[in-house]
Amino acid sequence: MAKEGVEKAEETEQMIEKEAGKEPAEGGGGDGSHRLGDAQEMRAVVLAGFGGLNKLRLFRKAMPEPQDGELKIRVKACGLNFIDLMVRQGNIDNPPKTPLVPGFECSGIVEALGDSVKGYEIGDRVMAFVNYNAWAEVVCTPVEFVYKIPDDMSFSEAAAFPMNFVTAYVMLFEVANLREGMSVLVHSAGGGVGQAVAQLCSTVPNVTVFGTASTFKHEAIKDSVTHLFDRNADYVQEVKRISAEGVDIVLDCLCGDNTGKGLSLLKPLGTYILYGSSNMVTGETKSFFSFAKSWWQVEKVNPIKLYEENKVIAGFSLLNLLFKQGRAGLIRGVVEKLIGLYNQKKIKPVVDSLWALEEVKEAMQRIHDRGNIGKLILDVEKTPTPLMANDSTETSEAGEEEEDHEGDSENKERMPFIQ
């Protein structure tokens, strides 16, 4: 998307490919390092190929320049989302070619303007959606995906804002038409979207929020939802014990057998929305068995049954809405409403933790283990913390040590920086 010098781009591609194959690149320095022009290079997290954490590298890469209609942003912080794990595994429809720079959202300072860009100036503080390439020191993205941020919003908050709050708002108000007195069930209530859903529900009178989350998160998030259940419990019976008719809205990021459970909980005229499929991610790499099992467990929906029971089933993908279906204008209106709520102190992004670019492996492992409460942020200017001796221990979701997998020995080391 952004224009780069052909020679520099080719050199960077060779660096990535040779490093992934453990071969020294031609023309490197005598110490084995790889250099681009210091004045026009940047650091970027690069996914060399689909698979485990060992596919991630930190490279010096040619800096992009804005094309017509684009802004160049000096990145301060980037958001890390569950979709980034699925991209790393290649566990998405029509995955892009590797090598690539992951990431879909960031915040920072406008550094340059492409031709025909209006409404922005160099030095503006902004947050943005990016169609990949966000995990870098500099990004270029079309102006329609860029939004100015309030003066009192930190860059880490701004990086935690777009994906989570826009997703939550569109599902609640554009798709499900949330109104006073309704009830909502949200899975992964302790995650970034889950916390955004809880906060937005609090802006509507008398909304009851049912949430599922890992038990260790309950103390931290108990005040944000009305009723909280363990993610492994029989939440269907728990919800019906409290509300015999069920709920008006189900927000499902899990998929699998939760689809049927969610539909069974809907009241007449209720809406079930699928916006993720995290149950398909079990191991560090893509698993055909996990994918097949999760897909097999999805209840086959009969339209006649929906008609008879007066139920609505929907899906939502923010990235597809933005980058494939051309609804940037709709999303800009949503962002403006959300910033208004932020300025009124009614919503505030929940940031779980900040990670250096060098620590992206550890950050991804934390979100894979469902250990986060709120959003994980890559802080571009953060210095990586020293590795602890026991940081390399890998555990399952049940807290038990997992067996070593092929390539795991490399995953237990800090991601190397390839100059």
From Swiss-Prot:
Keyword Phosphoprotein attributed: yes
Domain of life: Eukaryota
GO molecular function, one term: zinc ion binding
Region (Disordered): 1-36, 384-419
Protein name listed in UniProt: Synaptic vesicle membrane protein VAT-1 homolog-like
Tissues expressed in: Detected in skin fibroblasts.
Phosphoserine modification, residue list: S392, S396
Residue(s) carrying Phosphothreonine: T393, T395
InterPro entries: ADH-like_N, GroES-like_sf, NAD(P)-bd_dom_sf, PKS_ER, Quin_OxRdtase/zeta-crystal_CS, SV-ATPase_mito-regulator
EC number of the protein: 1.-.-.-
